[in-house]
Amino acid sequence: MPAHSLVMSSPALPAFLLCSTLLVIKMYVVAIITGQVRLRKKAFANPEDALRHGGPQYCRSDPDVERCLRAHRNDMETIYPFLFLGFVYSFLGPNPFVAWMHFLVFLVGRVAHTVAYLGKLRAPIRSVTYTLAQLPCASMALQILWEAARHL
């Protein structure tokens, strides 16, 4: 089956593919930022990296590096489930506009969460963006469960 036929087999799939690819790119950006912060703060996780950049005293932790790592871990805890849920949801035959809104709300919520986390924005901005992004995931999960249960 040609690639364009697979994409067109579900009207919601192109929107999911666009948003999920942007989210993966966002995760790469956070990883790059983490590396840049490590270099700027001279805080390396591995002795061989510290030796290369000034000596063993630079094998240490740093609060800003730890913040980047927490942001990345939070991405993994939320984006990986979204990739599964969104893919399956795309094949349930959802209204294309509603599907777009699910995917877009998650994407915007996660980007805003990263900005809030790395930018050290005041509370409760980060928790609001986290919750906002989780709402479409909960909706998709419930719809998947409902459809799966109906077909038992």
Swiss-Prot record:
GO CC, alphabetical = endoplasmic reticulum membrane; membrane; nuclear envelope lumen; perinuclear region of cytoplasm
Q: In which pathway does it act?
A: Lipid metabolism; prostaglandin biosynthesis
Site note Essential for protaglandin-E synthase activity, residues: D49, R126
Q: Pull the Lumenal topological domain ranges from the record.
A: 1-12, 91-95
Task: Give the bilayer topology.
Answer: Multi-pass membrane protein
Q: What is the effect of changing R126K?
A: Loss of prostaglandin-E synthase activity. Transforms prostaglandin-E synthase activity to prostaglandin-F(2alpha)synthase activity
What InterPro entries does the record tag this protein with?
MAPEG-like_dom_sf, Membr-assoc_MAPEG, MGST1-like
Substituting Q36E results in: Keeps about 40-50% of prostaglandin-E synthase activity
Q: Which residues lie on this side of the membrane: Cytoplasmic?
A: 42-60, 120-123
Q: Which cofactor does it need?
A: glutathione
Induction behaviour = Induced by the interleukin IL1B. Induced By p53/TP53.
The protein, known as:
Prostaglandin E synthase
Q: Where does glutathione bind?
A: R38, R73, N74, D75, M76, E77, H113, Y117, R126, S127, V128, T129, Y130
Changing Q134E: reported impact? Keeps about 40-50% of prostaglandin-E synthase activity
Which compartment or compartments is the protein found in? Membrane; Cytoplasm, Perinuclear region
User: What Gene3D superfamilies does this protein map onto?
Assistant: Membrane associated eicosanoid/glutathione metabolism-like domain (1.20.120.550)
For this protein's source organism, the top of the classification is: Eukaryota, Metazoa, Chordata, Craniata, Vertebrata
- Which is a Pfam family this sequence falls into? MAPEG
Q: Which reaction does it catalyse?
A: prostaglandin H2 = prostaglandin E2; 2-glyceryl-prostaglandin H2 = 2-glyceryl-prostaglandin E2; prostaglandin G2 = (15S)-15-hydroperoxy-prostaglandin E2; 1-chloro-2,4-dinitrobenzene + glutathione = 2,4-dinitrophenyl-S-glutathione + chloride + H(+)
Subunit notes for this chain?
Homotrimer.
Query: What sections of the protein cross the membrane?
Result: 13-41, 61-90, 96-119, 124-152
Picking any one GO molecular function of the record gives:
prostaglandin-E synthase activity
> What stretch or stretches form a coiled coil here?
none
Q: What does this protein do?
A: Terminal enzyme of the cyclooxygenase (COX)-2-mediated prostaglandin E2 (PGE2) biosynthetic pathway. Catalyzes the glutathione-dependent oxidoreduction of prostaglandin endoperoxide H2 (PGH2) to prostaglandin E2 (PGE2) in response to inflammatory stimuli. Plays a key role in inflammation response, fever and pain. Also catalyzes the oxidoreduction of endocannabinoids into prostaglandin glycerol esters and PGG2 into 15-hydroperoxy-PGE2.
What organism does this protein naturally occur in?
Homo sapiens
List the GO biological process terms: cell population proliferation; negative regulation of cell population proliferation; positive regulation of prostaglandin secretion; prostaglandin biosynthetic process; prostaglandin metabolic process; regulation of fever generation; regulation of inflammatory response; sensory perception of pain
